[in-house]
Amino acid sequence: MPRSQINGNFIDKTFSIVANILLRIIPTTSGEREAFTYYRDGMSAQSEGNYAEALQNYYEAMRLEIDPYDRSYILYNIGLIHTSNGEHTKALEYYFRALERNPFLPQAFNNMAVICHYRGEQAIRQGDSEIAEAWFDQAAEYWKQAISLTPGNYIEAHNWLKITGRFG
């Protein structure tokens, strides 16, 4: 039984009902429907902190999904899980892969910037200011891309760019 049919969360149930209606209305193949079911179940597991289950569902959705745009969101969510688990190198890889398929994911650019900024702070704590500056410069580039896609969002990043002289 798909996870979405047993989940007690009101929002998840509502999303599942709406998604099922849309899947009936919009012409889709059985493979696309199955991929979406795995994706939806992955999101449900992820929202509950069941990352291993979420990853299994996302990997299965990736196996079935052929649309690059839809795959970008699956890859992005896999990146989120790796970020949550502190696996920043893996997370960056999945965010890059998501952006290869959909370059209009400001949240992926933002998350990549956050990881780079974090690594810059780690380098400072280790006494390596040169490496820190390189990480901060990379964070700035990613934040600029996120901001250019969604002006008015990422206010803290925008302020950091101004304060550090990296906006421009």
Swiss-Prot record:
Keyword Transferase: no
GO terms under biological process: photosynthesis
Pfam families: TPR_1
GO CC field: chloroplast thylakoid membrane
The organism of origin for this protein: Coffea arabica (Arabian coffee)
Places the protein is found: Plastid, Chloroplast thylakoid membrane
Family to which the UniProt record says this protein belongs: Belongs to the Ycf3 family.
Chain's gene name: ycf3
HAMAP family per the UniProt record, alphabetical: Ycf3
Main localisation: plastid
Keywords per UniProt: Chloroplast, Membrane, Photosynthesis, Plastid, Repeat, Thylakoid, TPR repeat
Membrane-topology annotation of the record: Peripheral membrane protein
TPR repeats (start-end): 35-68, 72-105, 120-153
Protein name from the UniProt record: Photosystem I assembly protein Ycf3
Superkingdom of origin: Eukaryota
General function of this protein: Essential for the assembly of the photosystem I (PSI) complex. May act as a chaperone-like factor to guide the assembly of the PSI subunits.
